Amino acid sequence: MALVDVQAQDKLKNMPGYEQYREIAPQIRRSVKPGTLYVNWEEDGKSFTYVQDGKQWQYDIRKKKATELGAPPAVERRPRGFRPARGRQYPSAESPDGNWRAYTENRNMYLSKPDGSGKMAITTDGNMENMNKYGIATWVYGEELGQNTAMWWSPDSKKIAFYKFNEKGAKQYYVLLDQLQLYDSLEIMSYPKVGEPNLPVDLMVYDLETKEMMQFDVRDGKDFDDGPLGTYLYGMSWTPDGKEFLYHSTNRKQDIMEYRAGNPETGETRVVVREEWLASFTKNTPEMRVLADGEHFIWASERTGFNNYYLYNWDGTLVNPITQHEFEVANIVRVDEEDGVMYYMARSGDNHMKMQLHRVRLDGKKDTRLTDPSMNHSVDIAPDGKHFIDIVQTHNTPPRTLLIDDKGKELDVF
């Protein structure tokens, strides 16, 4: 096959017009300007740098002037890190303080120092006889729920939470691995197909100081029933102060979803936000932004039929809707807690495909669209929020890069 490819490429040189193509191809590339400019803002928001025509420039907003800085810096290629295979989870997690490594091995959870010394088991009943397994999820979690982690350290590195699954009664599925190697391998997994019961799932938490294990009450004292809430547990994290463990819980139909918080000292859990859309389905992991004040978070919900943003307290109290649109909000761009404002993209153009930048107060007041609704926009906001770079285009209008102020006024074009 490789020989055929080489011969085909050699024949190209003998085609009519090949020499003319070689001569004009570089000219064509240089004659077309892309129209898109990607910038790096300075921390004070008063200037930014960018690369254009093979040179690096610095633009001063006050002077509206670009100064050439010379050749652009070399692009630093970061080595590609380890990623779990499709449908799988990371097999280990290092503690935030760097002193511990948690990992799963032979269906049990272990702790050790980062160099592997001081190994100790924190579970011992994970085996093929009782079909328990810890620190790893089933295929559906990675494949359909995007869950690529199975263990989660508290911010102070004193606790580690992790999955527990029981695979009793589940039918076995045979997977052939390493098919590109000299010798392949076989993995047997418990995999419920359509109509088969799902596997019981629980969440455990281990305290490194007290050496005590706690199981979270993820189903309000009820056993796993493969249908009600608690069928799937996913989207885990800790609160910034480490006092509660957060997770999403949904039923098999996925038309009810609860965002819940668990007490790692008692195992008790509570509902923070509940979403229900019985006519269809709820989004598995709605967009969320935790605020730096440690008391509030922003939550996206389609409860009105349109995706909007809501401000919540951690106790589950709705403070206020931030947006109340009859069009879809798309994503949060920036939250300025000091000024109490949020910038976000929304489908509020003259058709829903054209993304627009909005600014709104966190109390839901003074929602303002800052961009031209006849165009589609991609923005990069300055750190001080006073300006933004705006790449504007439509399906039949070439992209242009603009400098816009916080009132929506165009200041310059690049």
Label every model-predicted segment.
Residues 49-54, 60, 101-107, 113, ...:
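Beta-strand C-termini and the immediately following turn/loop, strongest in propeller blades
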Residues 61-64, 114-117, 208-211, 264-267, ...:
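Short loop/turn segments that connect beta-strands within beta-propeller blades
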